[in-house]
């Protein structure tokens, strides 16, 4: 994309437009791997030379006169005729995404870089591979030569020159010889080097009187005048001289053994870093060995030696080092036809055809392309594979040929490379002979390809049967070896058979392949492999029946919950699968390459989200299974699913065994870290105190199915231990399926019906009261139960059940104890989360927590629940907010949870390590609650948050304010709240001594004492560190707009206040000061713009405003116009958070609020995007004020439109779900309207619709 006036290369920090998925996006250059090739015209002898920019002194500009270093080391004057920027630029897009690109994919910001005539949206989805309209129509000449017009005469000269050069490079008698090169600087000095073909390196011009050599000392390539070269008979040099002269030792080893020196090879780890795909090649290669062994059984003739991963690594090490030394490093995994290109295999296939120069026909190249196993997407296949070969391997082929370097599996039993130097007719004959042989070698050499393996192996078998008399004699010895090896593999198979009768051969070989995949390149000793196999087989044995029965049930049960679980299961199996998809109807129907991004079940039918290769993601679509053509080795999703499920189950069985062993030792099963990271998902659903889970008739099927699964499972697991436990678990069993079924439903609906919830809760609490006495036992049983839950469902259900049970226990006494149970529920949740991430050791801590929670329950139990609704003054929201939020949270929690979970579920899975850190934190916090009454600890157990950042120190209190100015921001998903919250948790707040000893479920505000200013400041500094983390997490959220990511505080749905935010950070810095009473009401600004929002907004705002009921919101509104910034110190934003039912204790008196205010009399203002100071407006005259406000409105409107589109997509999904839940939602709707009319506190009426309202409306 370089224009004439652009610099030769770009520097770090340059703003550019970079190509990303076919479109140009704003980006900044982060790092540069600089490599500028300069073509210069030497004034002295009028010849051209290609040098790198470090060989040139002077300005890098076409036409500039510079000094350039010539091959003999001297500097000559020259004119730059062409500059090529071959640098690699790592750019960072504004969303934090990074890409490493060449200069051709970048252009300086502000350049016109698209054809204005059309947008990508108008392009038809007809043929993604022939994407005919270029994004920019500027670059016409795509050839590698300079774009200056070339005259016919010049062309002829060039071609004749090339022919001469070819002859010269083939006939040079020095090729492959070790020579001594006289050093250019000191004439007395010399170094050993290997003479190689000049065509190895296009960038170095080698004149007629020069040779290209590779030094044994630094492995670099040099063109050296022939007069400076002397042939050396290294083999006859005395040992003393060999050891003294650097490089001589290496040269002599090379001559004797043809082993290249280490400095001519790249470390394999570097190769794996630069091309992560090579990682997969290793295992795939061993995988293929298995296939080959099977092929050998069916086809005794195959005498080829086993494919050699070591040799392949050896090849890659030399190739990568060669490419780097000649200035063309392979920085990214080479790709051909959307598949990783296996360079070793390509090299071998071309070698068998007589080398690149001897392949004249496109058909041969096409055959090579097919043999690589890459599907042919278009007519350019043969051209593409040829150019890929020329780019990556041609120079290396020339180098190997001239240096006589060979690779076992490439040249094995084949005519030696030297023979390729015969004249053309001979090598063509050779190619024909080899042609017949090629398929054979191919069976052997499939290091990467298993994609079209079925069709390919058929083809191979046919060809294998062709007579091959001539060659067989030469390979007799080899075939004997082969037979021995076959016998070994057969023995191995027999062993496995005896151990595992149920499992058929196919399955077993699949298992072996899995092992090999695991073992990868490590070349694990055979015994170890066998051991692993045996273990797996014995596990398999016991599980086989279980799996079968379960699979049957999975297919039978069509319940929503089941469907969803299936979908969960399928996703890991199918995601990323490359498939073909039929597009269009009738005559116009075409088939496209695509990959499956995710799967979903709709009315019992599986839908797949596919991404068409070569197409913008806007063309991704949901398709039914009948439009998908599965690859042969997949045979549809089912097979693969089952295989994966089986492997998963094997590993789970192992875990279970371990656990049982430990149970017997400690009397309690440690929850292993293998609990899936989906845990928060299950937990959050139930963790909210009010909206626990609603029972609806449609769920009964689900219950039955789940219970059936449980029963089957128990029968099949014959351990007595478990049988005994089953009795204890009966009650839990009954409850479990209900809850998990509901949870699943809730996932789908993203709605909760408080009415149902309350009913259910009452019922549950009765049951729980019975259970509660032996709570510890129950927790253990729950854990066991979780482990028993049906394996077929993958780990999801396991975690769900566990969390449900825990929550169930935690919900005990909710009715009796007012807000207190929330605390417990939450901490239990924490502990279960912890379990998820830690091994059994942490469990002790968890148990401690649980016990402490019991104590706490007793303390808190005394406070009456009526206090929840008590609000003296809606406008006094300030300090007490954190306490007041609790009650509101209770109501709103349920809905928020849902939102969160949906968004965070995935992230949680990605970030177990962070969760782990935070969990540890949480544990400390929970115990600190009790130990340090003088401190306020913030315990933010939101799993979501934890994902985004490590938890903040125990003394930090979350201070959360939100800008309600932009109501539309409410629509943003609660995700941002999480991020914001975490960033805001930096502000630490002190609590008045008058506070009753209420432990907040989240922040464990256990202290009646006030922290001193100094303390709060020091704590603040600790917690501030996290701000950066949070903002990053926030940016990464799907739903975020640019605006939001820039300004984390804007979008907080549950924001308690309009412009409190304004002072948010400053107050932090200034030691948490408090604004005067008058301001406090402003938080509620614009709170009630739409009726639907009233409850959500009220809820959210009230979380900050002192639990005012809806009726009290009206006075609050009056102040809203003033919009003076207010700071509230104890606002702890967690209410949004999915999990925390009782964030804040409701028992706070107005007097205390006033005390707070006195303590912190003032806080300085801080301006954010859509919040501003009144004095700012006062300073303007009326017209300025109007234009200013109009600008603000305009921004808000833009923002609103972006949210609107998001809402549309969510609505579409909801419509599908609504069909199923119409009756339930009616009940919920009436409930919500009642609550808004009567002014009930949101704690008792959280309308289900708001789940989404909060998220996006």
From Swiss-Prot:
Cross-linked residues, Glycyl lysine isopeptide (Lys-Gly) (interchain with G-Cter in SUMO2): 481, 513, 718, 738, 759
Positions with biased composition (Acidic residues): 151-165, 276-289, 301-310, 538-548, 562-571
Residue stretches of biased makeup (Basic and acidic residues): 290-300, 416-436, 485-501, 549-561, 647-662, 705-749, 775-790, 1063-1076
Region called DNA-binding, residue ranges: 4-121
Compositionally biased spans, kind Low complexity: 1226-1248
Keywords: Chromatin regulator, Differentiation, DNA-binding, Isopeptide bond, Nucleus, Phosphoprotein, Spermatogenesis, Transcription, Transcription regulation, Ubl conjugation
Modified residues (Phosphoserine): 676, 716, 864, 1109, 1145
Retinoblastoma protein binding: annotated span: 951-964
Cellular compartments per GO CC: nucleoplasm; nucleus; plasma membrane; Sin3-type complex; transcription repressor complex
Basic residues bias: start-end ranges: 523-533, 637-646
Domain of life: Eukaryota
Record comment regarding domains: The function of the Tudor-knot domain, also named chromodomain-like, is uncertain. One study suggests that it mediates binding to lysine-methylated histone tails, with strongest affinity for H4K20me3 and H3K36me3. However, another study failed to find any interaction between this domain and histone H4K20me3 peptide.
Protein name: AT-rich interactive domain-containing protein 4A
């Amino acid at each position: 994309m370089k224009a004439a006036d652009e610099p030769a290369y770009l520097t770090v920090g340059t703003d550019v437009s970079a190509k990303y998925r076919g479109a140009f996006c704003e980006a900044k250059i982060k790092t540069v791997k600089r490599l500028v090739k300069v073509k210069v015209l030497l004034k002295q002898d009028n010849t051209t030379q290609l040098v790198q920019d470090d060989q040139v002194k002077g300005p890098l500009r076409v036409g500039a006169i510079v000094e350039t270093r010539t091959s003999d080391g001297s500097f000559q004057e020259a004119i730059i005729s062409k500059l090529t920027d071959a640098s690699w630029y790592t750019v960072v897009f504004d969303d934090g995404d990074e890409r490493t690109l060449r200069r051709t994919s970048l252009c300086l910001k502000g350049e016109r870089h698209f054809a204005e005539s059309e947008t990508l949206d108008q392009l038809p989805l007809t043929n993604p591979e022939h994407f005919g309209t270029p994004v920019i129509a500027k670059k016409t000449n795509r050839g590698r030569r300079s774009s200056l017009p070339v005259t016919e005469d010049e062309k002829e000269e060039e071609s004749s020159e090339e022919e001469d050069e070819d002859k010269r490079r083939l006939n040079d008698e020095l090729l492959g010889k070790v020579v001594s090169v006289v050093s250019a600087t000191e004439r007395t000095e010399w170094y050993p080097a290997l003479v190689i073909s000049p065509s190895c390196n296009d960038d170095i011009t080698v004149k007629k009187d020069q040779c290209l050599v590779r030094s044994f000392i630094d492995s670099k390539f040099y063109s050296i005048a022939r007069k400076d070269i002397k042939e050396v008979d290294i083999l006859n040099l005395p040992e003393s001289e060999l050891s003294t002269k650097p490089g001589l030792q290496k040269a002599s080893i090379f001559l004797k053994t043809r082993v290249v020196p280490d400095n001519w090879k790249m470390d394999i780890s570097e190769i794996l870093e630069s091309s992560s795909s090579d990682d997969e090649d290793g295992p795939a290669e061993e995988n293929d060995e298995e296939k080959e062994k099977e092929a050998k059984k069916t086809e005794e003739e195959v005498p080829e030696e086993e494919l050699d991963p070591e040799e392949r690594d050896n090849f890659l090490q030399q190739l990568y080092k060669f490419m780097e030394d000649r200035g063309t490093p392979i920085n990214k995994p080479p790709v051909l036809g959307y598949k990783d290109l296996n360079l070793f295999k390509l090299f071998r296939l071309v070698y068998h055809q007589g080398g690149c120069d001897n392949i004249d026909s496109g058909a041969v190249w096409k055959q090579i392309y097919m043999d690589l196993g890459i599907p042919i997407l278009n007519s350019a296949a043969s051209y593409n594979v040829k150019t890929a070969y020329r780019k990556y391997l041609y120079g290396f082929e020339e180098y190997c040929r001239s240096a006589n370097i060979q690779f076992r599996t490439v040249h094995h039993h084949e005519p030696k490379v030297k023979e390729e130097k015969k004249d053309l007719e001979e090598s063509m004959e050779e190619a024909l002979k080899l042609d017949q042989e090629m398929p054979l070698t191919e069976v052997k050499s499939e290091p990467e390809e298993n994609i079209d393996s079925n069709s390919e192996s058929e083809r191979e078998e046919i060809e294998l049967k062709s007579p091959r008399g001539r060659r067989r004699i030469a390979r007799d010895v080899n075939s004997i070896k082969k037979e021995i090896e076959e016998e070994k593999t057969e023995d191995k198979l027999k062993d496995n058979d005896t151990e595992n009768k149920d499992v058929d051969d196919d399955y077993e070989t699949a298992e072996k392949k899995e092992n090999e995949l695991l073992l990868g390149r490590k070349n694990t000793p055979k015994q170890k492999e066998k051991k692993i196999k045996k273990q797996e087989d014995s596990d398999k044995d016991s599980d086989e029946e279980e799996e079968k029965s379960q699979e049957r049930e999975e297919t039978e049960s069509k319940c929503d919950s089941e469907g969803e679980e299936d979908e969960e299961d399928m996703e890991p199996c199918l995601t990323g699968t490359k498939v073909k998809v039929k597009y269009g109807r009738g005559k116009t129907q075409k088939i496209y390459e695509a990959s499956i991004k995710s799967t979903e079940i709709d009315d019992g039918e599986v839908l797949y989200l596919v991404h068409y290769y070569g197409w913008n993601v806007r063309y991704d679509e949901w398709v039914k299974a009948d439009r998908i053509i599965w690859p042969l080795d997949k045979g549809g999703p089912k097979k693969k699913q089952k295989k994966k499920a089986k492997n998963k189950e094997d590993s789970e069985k192992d875990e279970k065994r371990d656990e049982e062993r430990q149970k017997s030792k400690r009397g309690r099963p440690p929850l292993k870290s293998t609990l899936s990271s989906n845990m928060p998902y299950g937990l959050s659903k139930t963790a909210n105190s009010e909206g626990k889970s609603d029972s609806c008739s449609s769920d009964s099927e689900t219950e039955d199915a789940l219970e059936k699964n449980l029963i089957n499972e128990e029968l099949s697991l014959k351990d007595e231990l478990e049988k005994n436990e089953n009795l204890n678990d009966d009650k839990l069993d009954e409850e479990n399926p209900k809850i998990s079924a509901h949870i699943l439903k809730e996932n789908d609906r993203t709605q909760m019906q408080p009415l149902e919830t309350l009913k259910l809760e009452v019922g549950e609490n009765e049951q729980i009261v019975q259970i509660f006495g032996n709570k510890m036992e129950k927790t253990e049983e729950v854990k066991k139960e979780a482990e028993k839950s049906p394996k077929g469902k993958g780990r999801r259900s396991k975690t769900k059940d566990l969390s449900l049970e825990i929550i169930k226990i935690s919900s005990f006494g909710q009715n009796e104890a007012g807000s207190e149970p929330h605390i417990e529920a939450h901490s239990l949740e924490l502990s279960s989360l912890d379990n998820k991430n830690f091994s059994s050791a942490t469990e002790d801590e968890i148990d401690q927590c649980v016990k402490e929670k019991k104590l706490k329950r007793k303390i808190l139990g005394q406070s009456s629940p009526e206090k929840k609704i008590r609000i003296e003054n809606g406008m006094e929201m300030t300090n007490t907010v954190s306490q007041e939020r609790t009650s509101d949270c209770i109501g709103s929690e349920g809905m928020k949870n849902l939102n969160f979970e949906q968004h965070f579920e995935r992230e949680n899975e990605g970030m177990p390590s962070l969760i782990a850190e935070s969990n540890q934190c949480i544990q400390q916090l929970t115990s600190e609650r009790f130990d340090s009454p003088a401190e306020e600890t913030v315990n933010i157990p939101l799993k979501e948050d934890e994902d985004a950042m490590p938890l903040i120190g125990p003394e930090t209190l979350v201070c959360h304010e939100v800008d309600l100015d932009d109501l539309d921001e409410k629509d943003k998903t609660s995700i941002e709240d999480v991020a914001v919250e975490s960033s805001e948790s930096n502000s630490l707040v002190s609590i008045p001594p008058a506070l009753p000893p209420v432990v907040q479920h989240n922040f464990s505000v256990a202290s009646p004492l006030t922290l001193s200013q100094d303390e709060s400041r020091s704590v603040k500094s600790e917690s501030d560190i996290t701000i950066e983390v949070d903002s990053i997490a926030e940016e990464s959220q799907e739903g975020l707009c640019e605006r939001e990511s820039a300004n984390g505080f804007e979008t907080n749905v549950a924001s308690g206040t309009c412009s409190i935010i304004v002072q948010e950070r400053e107050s932090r810095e200034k030691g948490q000061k408090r604004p005067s009473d008058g301001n406090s009401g402003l938080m509620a600004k614009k709170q009630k713009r739409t009726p639907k929002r009233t409850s959500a907004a009220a809820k959210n705002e009230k979380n900050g405003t002192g639990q005012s009921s809806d009726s009290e919101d009206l006075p609050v509104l009056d102040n809203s116009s003033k919009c003076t910034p207010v700071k509230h110190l104890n606002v702890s934003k967690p209410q949004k958070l999915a999990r925390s039912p009782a964030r804040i204790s409701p028992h706070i008196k107005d007097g205390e609020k006033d005390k707070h205010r006195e303590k912190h009399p003032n806080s300085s203002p801080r301006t954010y995007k859509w919040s501003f100071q009144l004095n700012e407006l006062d300073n303007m005259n009326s017209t300025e004020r109007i234009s200013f406000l109009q600008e603000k409105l305009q921004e808000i409107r833009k923002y609103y439109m972006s949210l609107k589109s998001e809402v549309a997509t969510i609505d579409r999904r909801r419509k599908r779900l609504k069909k199923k839940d119409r009756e339930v939602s009616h009940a919920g709707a009436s409930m919500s309207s009642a609550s808004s009319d009567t002014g009930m506190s949101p704690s008792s009426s959280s309308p289900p619709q708001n789940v989404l309202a909060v998220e996006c409306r």
